[in-house]
């Protein structure tokens, strides 16, 4: 196995991200926490939303020495009134949003027979619906300014033969369609929209609930590059897509999966 993951990861620097107003949903831990760390390191003004207060407060304290200390806002994104209030607060404090990263999600496992209408609705609300309404909240300002970036975070799961993820995979498939439709409608206003599709990223949640050596060996054997995809790899792609270097990248899915899918 290659050992490049043992080297210290250093992000590329994108000067145009400095001072940008960035909102990251689910930004308190896991991939979202790394996104918060990466954008704060670029000098962006980051607001990160999460329902998990303890982990988010700890991250906020850890990053207090960033060029612009990120701001944690507790928010249940499945509550649309709460969501709208949070974006109204950000508008008042920062004057708008330049970059939106719709990352929040929950990949609970389930059996088909156990799914109720209420559970269906809850999974769509936590994995898909808020991405639309967060985008809706920032679009007026982006249109007025003539620029903006929306990155929706999908999943490799529905591209591969997984089980017990029926609703998660349904929502993640919907994200790609929603993003393409959004990109088509808002491109004329200078706004870009893309989907970031992480591969088998071992997050703290994955390690605690599902990860094991046999599963990792199986995944690595299926990848073109037989090494683990790290959270920093996902954040590095997001930085590029949010920057002006990706100014003609829109309406597409960008995989960071070490060649697990499609090769």
What residues fall within each predicted segment?
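Active-site helix of classical SDR
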Residues: 135, 171, 179
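Canonical Rossmann dinucleotide-binding motif of NAD(H)/NADP(H)-dependent dehydrogenases/reductases
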Residues: 16-47
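Alpha-helical segment proximal to the catalytic Tyr-Lys
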Residues: 140, 184-188, 247
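C-terminal substrate-recognition "lid" of short-chain dehydrogenase/reductases
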Residues: 132, 147, 192, 228-256, ...
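Substrate-binding pocket helix/loop in short-chain dehydrogenase/reductase
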Residues: 111-112, 116-124, 216-219
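Active-site loop-to-helix junction immediately N-terminal to the catalytic Tyr of the SDR YXXXK motif
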Residues: 107, 115, 161-169, 181
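Short C-terminal tail/terminal secondary-structure segment
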Residues: 2-13, 160, 239, 250-263
């Amino acid at each position: 196995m290659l050992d490049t993951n043992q080297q210290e990861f250093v992000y590329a620097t994108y000067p145009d991200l400095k001072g940008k107003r960035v909102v990251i949903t689910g930004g308190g831990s896991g991939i979202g926490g790394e996104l918060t760390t990466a954008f704060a390191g670029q000098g962006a003004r980051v607001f990160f939303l999460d329902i998990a207060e303890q982990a988010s407060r700890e991250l906020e304290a850890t990053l207090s020495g960033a060029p612009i200390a990120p701001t944690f806002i507790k928010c249940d994104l499945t509550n649309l009134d709460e969501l709208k209030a949070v974006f109204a607060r950000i508008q008042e404090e920062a004057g708008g949003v330049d970059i939106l990263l719709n990352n929040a999600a929950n990949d609970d496992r389930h059996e088909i027979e156990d799914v109720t209408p209420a559970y269906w609705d809850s999974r769509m609300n936590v994995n898909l619906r808020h991405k639309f309404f967060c985008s809706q909240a920032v679009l007026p300002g982006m249109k007025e300014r003539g620029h903006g970036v929306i990155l929706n975070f999908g999943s490799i799961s529905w591209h591969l033969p997984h089980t017990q993820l029926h609703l998660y995979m349904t929502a993640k498939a919907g994200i790609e369609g929603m993003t393409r439709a959004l990109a088509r409608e808002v491109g004329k206003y200078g706004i870009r929209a893309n989907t970031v599709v992480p591969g088998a990223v071992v997050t703290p949640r994955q390690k605690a609930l599902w990860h094991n050596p046999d599963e990792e060996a199986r995944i690595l054997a299926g990848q073109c590059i037989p090494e683990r995809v790290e959270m920093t790899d996902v954040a590095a792609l997001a930085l590029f897509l949010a920057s002006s270097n990706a100014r003609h990248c829109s309406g597409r899915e960008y995989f960071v999966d070490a060649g697990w899918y499609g090769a």
